[in-house]
Every structure is written in C-alpha cells, then in structure tokens.
UniProtKB/Swiss-Prot annotation:
Protein name as catalogued: V-type proton ATPase subunit G 2
PANTHER family cross-referenced by the UniProt entry: V-TYPE PROTON ATPASE SUBUNIT G 2, VACUOLAR ATP SYNTHASE SUBUNIT G
Keywords: Cytoplasmic vesicle, Hydrogen ion transport, Ion transport, Membrane, Transport
Pfam families reported in the protein's UniProt record: V-ATPase_G
Membrane topology classification: Peripheral membrane protein
Chain's gene name: ATP6V1G2
Polar residues bias (residue ranges): 57-69, 78-89
Keyword Calcium appears in the UniProt entry: no
GO terms, biological process: synaptic vesicle lumen acidification
C-alpha cells in the first residue's frame, strides 16, 4: 500500500512537472509570436517610411519642374501683356483719328449694283 501511495505521488509529481513544462512552452510560444508580430510590424513601418520617402522625392521632383514651368509661363505672359499695353499706347491716337475719320467723313455713293429703273 505504501509503494502504491508512493507510485501515485510520483505520478502526480510527474504530471505536475509535465503541466509546468507545457505551460512554459505555451509562454515561450506566446513570447515568440509576440516578438515575431512586433518585428513584422517594424518591417512594415520601415517599408512604409521608405515608400513614403520615395513618393515625396518623386513628387518634389515633379512639382519642382512644374513650378519652374509655371514661373516661365507667368513671366512670358507678363512680357506679352506689357508689349500689348505699349502697342496700345503708341497706336491709340492714330487709331482713334482713323476711326473718327471713317465715321464722320461720310461720302454718299450709289451702290454699283443699284439699277435705276425708269
């Protein structure tokens, strides 16, 4: 009976040690999963930062050249407007005199296609 009781005690202790080993293994597995998840998250963040930096540099390059083009177009437009204004100032009096002459100096004439029928 004592040997049977001692055998039961050994089995209980062995079962307890096995349960502890299983619990430790589960804890290690949970730690490994957590660590792997953190590493994967860090890799994703690093990749995202690299792609964002790449995008920003490409966008800056595209917008920078576009900004130069818009400045050139604006400067050309200003130059053309100034040319038109100076041309208008130079020719204003002559055009007004010509226009007034055409309106005020009326010379009545019979149209060449008009047929006098009598």
């Amino acid at each position: 009976m004592a040997s049977q009781s001692q055998g039961i005690q050994q089995l209980l202790q062995a079962e307890k040690r096995a349960a502890e080993k299983v619990a430790d293994a589960r804890k290690r597995k949970a730690r490994r999963l957590k660590q792997a998840k953190e590493e994967a998250q860090m890799e994703v963040e690093q990749y995202r930062r690299e792609r964002e930096h790449e995008f920003q540099s490409k966008q800056q390059a595209a917008m920078g050249s576009q900004g130069n083009l818009s400045a050139e177009v604006e400067q050309a437009t200003r130059h053309q407007v100034q040319g038109m204004q100076s041309s208008q100032q130079r020719n204003r009096e002559r055009v007004l005199a010509q226009l007034l002459g055409m309106v005020c100096d009326v010379r009545p004439q019979v149209h060449p296609n008009y047929r006098i029928s009598a």
